[in-house]
Structure formats: C-alpha cells, structure tokens
Amino acid sequence: MSRKQLALFEPTLVVQALKEAVKKLNPQAQWRNPVMFIVWIGSLLTTCISIAMASGAMPGNALFSAAISGWLWVTVLFANFAEALAEGRSKAQANSLKGVKKTAFARKLREPKYGAAADKVPADQLRKGDIVLVEAGDIIPCDGEVIEGGASVDESAITGESAPVIRESGGDFASVTGGTRILSDWLVIECSVNPGETFLDRMIAMVEGAQRRKTPNEIALTILLIALTIVFLLATATLWPFSAWGGNAVSVTVLVALLVCLIPTTIGGLLSAIGVAGMSRMLGANVIATSGRAVEAAGDVDVLLLDKTGTITLGNRQASEFIPAQGVDEKTLADAAQLASLADETPEGRSIVILAKQRFNLRERDVQSLHATFVPFTAQSRMSGINIDNRMIRKGSVDAIRRHIEANGGHFPADVDQKVDQVARQGATPLVVVEGSRVLGVIALKDIVKGGIKERFAQLRKMGIKTVMITGDNRLTAAAIAAEAGVDDFLAEATPEAKLALIRQYQAEGRLVAMTGDGTNDAPALAQADVAVAMNSGTQAAKEAGNMVDLDSNPTKLIEVVHIGKQMLMTRGSLTTFSIANDVAKYFAIIPAAFAATYPQLNALNIMRLHSPDSAILSAVIFNALIIVFLIPLALKGVSYKPLTASAMLRRNLWIYGLGGLLVPFIGIKVIDLLLTVCGLV
C-alpha cells in the first residue's frame, strides 16, 4: 500500500519553496553547488556593473546590464526553487511521520516479566535494554523485541496499512516499532535502541534529507560539471583580450552572460532536486531508503535474489494429492495425514485436513477429545505430528522423515523415493507421512506461480538483470518451479550460509546484488548485499542489516525498487545530455552577437537571424533561466521508464534528450527574441 501522493506543485509547498529559494541565495548555501556558485558570482558582478553604469561611474548601457543581471538572479532562484521544492515534498512526507511521535509515559518494569512492579517514566527517557509493559490501547514507546506475550498491533501510522498484525515473543514476528498502537492483549518489550535512534527517528531523518550526502555517481557528475565550467571559464576569459586586440572590447556583462549560457547550468540547477526526488519516489512506494547511495545502487543492480514463497509464487501451498506407498491404500494415508495435521494451524496443515475431508469424508477431529499429544514443527526436527493410542504419526520433509525412520531402526522404501521425485518434478513440495517406522506415503503441496511473473522476468532479462530464485525446496521441485516462472537460476535447499556464499560469489564477479529478507537468519546476507530490502514485519536485526525497509513487507517490491533506482539514474543522465546539448544553440546565439562587431565573418553563425546583438544575448539568458523551471516536473517525477536493453535505452535517450536538447533552444531563443522585439523591449 502506498501513501497518499502529493500534487507536483502543491500551493503551500510552492510558497514555502519560493521562500527557501530566497534564503538559499546566501554564499554558504550556493558554495555547495559549484556550477550555480559561478552563476551567483556572475549575478553579483553584473549587478555591481549595472549600479556603476546607472550612477555614471562606468560607461555602457545600464538598462541592458540590469536586465542581464536580473535574469541571472532569476536563474539562481529557479535552481534554488527546484531544490527547495524537492526538499519541501520530502519534508511534507516527514511531517506526516512526525505526527506519529507522541509524548507519552511508559511502564518500565523492574523485572523482565509480566506482573512485575513498574515505574511510570517519560518514553523519551527509555534506554536500550529497558523492559516495558504495554497493554491494549497503549502506544508502544520504543523499538524493541517482544520477550513475553502476544498482541494485535495497529502499524498503520508507520506502514499506511490498516489491517492489524500479530506481534509475539519468539520467531520472526517479535520485532515492534515505537509509535504503533496495541489493539488487544499485552506485550513485555525489551527496548533495542536509545532515544533519538528509533526506526521512526531514522525514517524522519532520512526522508527530510537535511544532511543528504551525495552519492558516488552524483559526485562523479559534479566533478565533470566543474571541469566543464572551468574549461568554459578559461575560454571566456581569453575572449576579452582577443576582442580588445580587435579594437572593440566586449563588455564584462556580455562575457558573464556568455559564460553562464555555456556552462551546464540546467543540470547544475536540477542535480540536487533529482537526488532528493529519487528518495521521495522510493517513499511513495512505501520503501524507506537509508541513503541516496542505496537508491542509486538499486539502479545499477544486475542480480536479483528472490524468495520463491510470496515473491514468485502466491505463497499459499495447498495439499493437492495423497500418494500412498506400496501396500497402503489412499484412505489410510489420508486419515493419518489428517490426524497429524489436526493441531497444525499453518495454511498447509489446514489444507491437508480439508483435502482428507473432501476426498474421504473424514471429519475433522478434536485433539483434546482424542486425548492425543500434538508434536509441533521445529526448525531442528523439520516435522510435526501426533501421538495417539500408542500410534506415533509424523509428517515432514523427505530428509527429516528419512532420519527419523533410520533413527528408529527402519528403512526408507525405494518406491517412496520415486514418488517423492515424481511430485518434485511436477513443481510441488513433497511431505512424507510415517507411522512409527512405516512410511504411509506422500502428500503433494502445490504452490501457484503468480500470473504475469514470467513476463516481468523476461523484461528484467532484457535489461541485463539476472534473476535467481531462493527456496528451501529440494532441487527437483526448485528446478520445476524455476522453469515455470522463467527465472535464470535457482538456489535450492537454501540456508543462510548458502545465501551469503552466493552473494559473495556474484560480487566477486563484479556484479551488484539485491535481495529481500525478514528474519534474523537473513541479516548476514542482507548486510552483504548491495541493495538489501528488509521487511518491516521482520526482526530488528534484519531491519538494521538492510539499507532499505519495505513498510508493506511485500517481497515482490524488490522489482519496483530496482525500477525506481534505474529511473533516477536515467533522469540524471537524460537531463545531463539535454543540458550539454542545448549549449550548442546558445553558442550560435551569443557568439555572433558578442563578436560580430569585431569579427564580421561571425555573422554567418547567426542562423537564427536574431533581431540585434542585445536581443540575442538577452534571449539566450532568459531561455537559460526558463528551461530550469520547465524541467522541474521531469526532475521530480523522473523520465519515462521502459524496460529495455542498455544499448536500446541509450539510443532512445540520445534521440529524445540529445536531439531535443539541440532543437528546443533554437526554437525557444527565437521565440523569446521575437517577443522582446514585438514588445519593444530591445
């Protein structure tokens, strides 16, 4: 579920951004953007020249110089406005999160158990390791782990999802977030962070982006822009002595206008806005990124590790068939399977009970009335079952049942091995049922591959991204599902160690890897991955290890995260191409206007047939300022993204933004020149 989207030009945000744009005119703020700092210096210089001309201290056209100066200041203001608007949108999103934080009191327990004596303390004084009790109606005062109890929790303030979730001690659902509300029952929580370090605090800080650090690609692009600016600065500086030597020295105002039009002011003015907007778009997808670096890395990813359950398949495996062992009838197998599943509350367990009822009219029986003992599933045993009337019935994975039989002196039958392989080859998961040391047969659990997922993987393959399915299933089942889903590779019988080793293997090959995870056992792999999306419903360890948190806890979101990252990189590249390309038109406008008096041959370059030198220079400066405003929506929304190969994407963007960057300024400058002439302003 995504949060409510802000309008691109929300009136209140625009007003606030205009105020911030004026505040950013101070030198300290401008220094952070070297390209726009040069424009700021040029604005200041031409303003001083205009005042000097108006007072008679300097010869020259004071009105023309003032017009150039005014539009240079407008250029700086527009660049400031773009950045301030992007930051304002992020801060508006952060303000909605700040509303979640409430000054409250917490019941700090003196001992780590329910019913212990408690002291009432302000929530902001809780420290890591403190134990608190929260009951129905209470706001959870800190991030932490549930050490006792279970409760229904409303996390809508954080995730935007109205459906409550269950949080309980033990397992992967013990993590709670400060600012969420208990709806029923009670929890004893151990705080896992100190004040100011909660997940909500970090979310607000990341979204506001007040101290946003530049990403590596941003730094590299900034260095390129600085280099271009220095080259054009030196080139412009050498033109004055050439014109003076020709007997008609060009004014400093014209040289400043030439410099500002030649340096890449368009991308220089929009670069920060693109980065902030990328983070904001990620939040729009209900994903919190720890930094712009994480969003950027998502755009460079070329390997996706995807969990099978919930990402590739629907995740609700259902019993589809009872396959009895040799000498066992199907009803006997179904009866034993149903008994072993009576107290199994998993979707798989309930589906076994229902299938036995549908096939053989075996009515569901109550475990307590049977005076039976239920044996729950554990990660160590990997099986569950029931002890009833001296009968010991178990169901579980093939390996687990094989070990169980051999430990009891039995032998795993060869015909059942064949049936297990048959089920696995069909893409189903085999569960083996055993009574004592006698194997009764196999239950086939069928999961459904999500509709359209194969086409999405084909698109990712076009983009050069390799998809790898991660599953705990055996190799035969994994291979069948991988073929059906259309993934490039798979890791079967996956363990945390195997995931970590696979990530390191791909990284050693120079690839960037993205993955999702929610459990403590996923933390090492999440920490190793280049893009690690932790589920908000997961453990604290997983969230701390990842560099993104999906508030919807939807593993499929990883594909959308990659799309957003690629869109940000494409937006930056496209606007850089446009910015550099449109310098060509400005060159044809200003060079003839500035130097035709000294070198008449340069009139041949006036292909736009602009009205006069003054109108040509002023038109180019006005266009240079206005194009920043026209491109703000593109910088904030991102360029149109289509899953294409790298070469096809490059060709497409060169045609649209390269050719567009060449043609648009010719049209724009000519139109502005005509308007200035018609209005008698030049």
Curated annotation (Swiss-Prot):
The residues forming a coiled coil are: none
Q: Where is the active site?
A: D307 (4-aspartylphosphate intermediate)
Q: Which domain of life is it from?
A: Bacteria
Q: Which SUPFAM superfamilies match?
A: Calcium ATPase, transduction domain A, Calcium ATPase, transmembrane domain M, HAD-like, Metal cation-transporting ATPase, ATP-binding domain N
**Catalytic activity field:** K(+)(out) + ATP + H2O = K(+)(in) + ADP + phosphate + H(+)
Q: Please list the residues that bind ATP.
A: D344, E348, F377, T378, A379, Q380, S381, R382, M383, S384, K395
* Topology in membrane: Multi-pass membrane protein
Chief place of localization: membrane
Q: Which Pfam families match?
A: E1-E2_ATPase, Hydrolase
Q: Report the function annotation for this chain.
A: Part of the high-affinity ATP-driven potassium transport (or Kdp) system, which catalyzes the hydrolysis of ATP coupled with the electrogenic transport of potassium into the cytoplasm. This subunit is responsible for energy coupling to the transport system and for the release of the potassium ions to the cytoplasm.
How is this protein named in the record?
A: Potassium-transporting ATPase ATP-binding subunit
**Source gene?**
kdpB
